[in-house]
């Protein structure tokens, strides 16, 4: 919005030229989202407490979690509001990629909101069914993928990390299916990771910061050519979007850090994962998400292995509990130690993913 309002004024006052620069708008998108999360956090915590929207704790989990029962949840409303407002304020709204990213974020957020609302407000034990939630995610991701591929004539090749000239073409239908897999998979992986105080939000912010770099580099022809990656002119505005994700995440962390005053709920975890997935698609760094979000992959795989092994062996388990962060808790690791060590893993994976820009 500010880009369109203030950039034309540059011919009268050169100071307004700064609004042309993606780096400037990315920084201020991040700061705006951070301030929104930071300022509105106490009000939301108090409001959710008054509404008795409190977290339900599984009795078969770590006993140390029982004291968290009743902690306000659905804090993802704050994150999503901050991200969307900040992006609308600072991004170039004529860029179709901005609307695709916001559409996926809003769509997945709405699914998470309905799920949380049914459980927390209407007191339904399970909210949306797993199948219903999955189908809705597929619909949202499918619409986004179709608009990108058919509406915008998007590139249907896939960039393979570490390989310079390996870019298989999936064809239009194949790429739409692939995009659905990336977005829905990322969304559910982040959702599974959100089980400890601050565990999910920091890796999300780290991943968003990494894709901020990918988006900026891909949008510049010289950088993209030098690094032998796909040049995506429209991806520059994804830096602004990612900046908003980073800022909103850090602002939310202030209240979500151990011991948490608020949890994000599905209304936070589902759209955050979906946002990472759609940015990966739009920047043509789809498979890099497996590295950038390796922590989320590890959490999701631990659940898949646990469930599969349990069914095959008729009752045996690989881990003490899944997702894997609970396994380490039950082994005796204090919750803060699990959280910080997982953050360290996320940082290492982010650095590795950035190295793929040059190692090819």
UniProtKB/Swiss-Prot annotation:
* Family the UniProt entry places it in: Belongs to the glycosyltransferase 4 family. MraY subfamily.
Q: What does this protein do?
A: Catalyzes the initial step of the lipid cycle reactions in the biosynthesis of the cell wall peptidoglycan: transfers peptidoglycan precursor phospho-MurNAc-pentapeptide from UDP-MurNAc-pentapeptide onto the lipid carrier undecaprenyl phosphate, yielding undecaprenyl-pyrophosphoryl-MurNAc-pentapeptide, known as lipid I.
- The portions of this protein that span the membrane are 25-45, 73-93, 94-114, 134-154, 173-193, 198-218, 240-260, 262-282, 287-307, 337-357
Q: In which pathway does it act?
A: Cell wall biogenesis; peptidoglycan biosynthesis
Subcellular location(s) per record: Cell inner membrane
Top enzyme class, one word, equals transferase
Reported cofactor(s): Mg(2+)
Q: What is this protein called?
A: Phospho-N-acetylmuramoyl-pentapeptide-transferase
Stated EC number for the protein is 2.7.8.13
Q: What is its main location?
A: membrane
Its membrane topology: Multi-pass membrane protein
In terms of HAMAP family, this protein maps to: MraY (MF_00038)
Sorted alphabetically, the keyword list is: Cell cycle, Cell division, Cell inner membrane, Cell membrane, Cell shape, Cell wall biogenesis/degradation, Magnesium, Membrane, Metal-binding, Peptidoglycan synthesis, Transferase, Transmembrane, Transmembrane helix
Q: Record's superkingdom?
A: Bacteria
């Amino acid at each position: 919005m500010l880009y369109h309002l203030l950039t034309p004024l540059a011919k009268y006052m050169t100071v307004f030229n700064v609004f042309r620069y993606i780096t400037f708008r990315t920084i201020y998108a991040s700061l705006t989202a951070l301030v929104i999360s930071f300022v509105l956090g106490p009000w939301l915590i108090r409001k959710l407490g008054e509404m008795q929207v409190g977290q339900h704790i599984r009795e078969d989990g770590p006993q140390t979690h029982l004291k968290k029962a009743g902690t306000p949840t659905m804090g993802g409303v704050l994150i999503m509001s901050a991200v969307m407002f900040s992006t609308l304020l600072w991004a170039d709204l004529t860029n179709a990629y901005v609307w695709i990213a916001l559409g996926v974020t809003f769509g997945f957020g709405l699914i998470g909101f309905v799920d949380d609302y049914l459980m927390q407000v209407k007191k339904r034990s399970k909210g949306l069914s797993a199948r219903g939630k999955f189908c809705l995610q597929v619909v949202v991701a499918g619409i986004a993928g179709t608009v990108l591929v058919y509406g915008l004539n998007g590139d249907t090749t896939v960039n393979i990390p570490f390989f310079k000239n390996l870019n298989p073409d999936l064809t239009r239908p194949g790429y739409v299916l692939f995009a659905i897999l990336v977005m829905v998979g990322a969304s559910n992986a982040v959702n599974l990771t959100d089980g400890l105080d601050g565990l999910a939000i920091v890796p999300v912010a780290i991943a968003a910061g990494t894709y901020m770099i990918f988006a900026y580099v891909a949008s510049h022809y010289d950088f993209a050519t030098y690094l032998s990656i796909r040049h995506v002119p429209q991806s520059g505005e994804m830096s602004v979007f990612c900046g908003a994700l980073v800022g909103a995440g850090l602002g939310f962390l202030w209240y979500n850090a151990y011991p948490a005053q608020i949890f994000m709920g599905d209304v936070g975890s589902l759209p955050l994962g979906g946002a990472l997935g759609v940015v990966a698609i739009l920047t043509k760094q789809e498979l890099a998400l497996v590295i950038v979000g390796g922590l989320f992959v590890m959490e999701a795989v631990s659940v898949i292995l646990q469930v599969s092994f349990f069914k095959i062996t008729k009752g045996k388990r690989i881990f003490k509990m899944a997702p894997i962060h609970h396994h380490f808790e039950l082994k005796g690791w204090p919750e803060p130690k699990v959280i910080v060590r997982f953050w360290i893993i996320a940082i290492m994976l982010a650095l590795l993913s950035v190295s793929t820009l040059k190692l090819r």
